[in-house]
Amino acid sequence: MIKYFDLQRISDSFEPEISDVIIRVLRSGWYLQGEENHLFEKAFADYCGTTCCVGVGNGLDALTLIFMAYCELGEMQPGDEVIVPANTYIASILGVIRAGMRPVFCEPSLL
């Protein structure tokens, strides 16, 4: 078999550092939140050139928080319509609904 993209070769260079972090997390017992999470959030915020970063468990949580933040900032409000592609993953819709908004389905155009 000819490998199209050798992920093993790429990940081998990161393996020692990643293994060390995994061991620290396992030994600490903090699988959610914890010091490693806070260190990552700080490093990622620095990398992005911003002051804050919030790690979430999945894309649905991320979308929900984004829409809730827009409401908090007054950019959107519950009941607003949010256009979503008709053929999408359910998290795209649930994030809108969780924030109290209404998804409006549309077919993308390739004009």
What feature does the model see in each segment?
Residues 1-30, 35:
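N-terminal "arm"/small-domain region of PLP-dependent enzymes with the aminotransferase-like
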Residues 30, 35-81, 95-99, 105:
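Phosphate-binding glycine-rich loop
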Residues 87-93:
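Conserved coil-to-alpha-helix start sites within the AMP-binding
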Residues 86, 105-109:
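Short beta->alpha connector loops at strand-helix junctions that form conserved
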Residues 6, 22, 44-45, 82:
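Short hydrophobic motif
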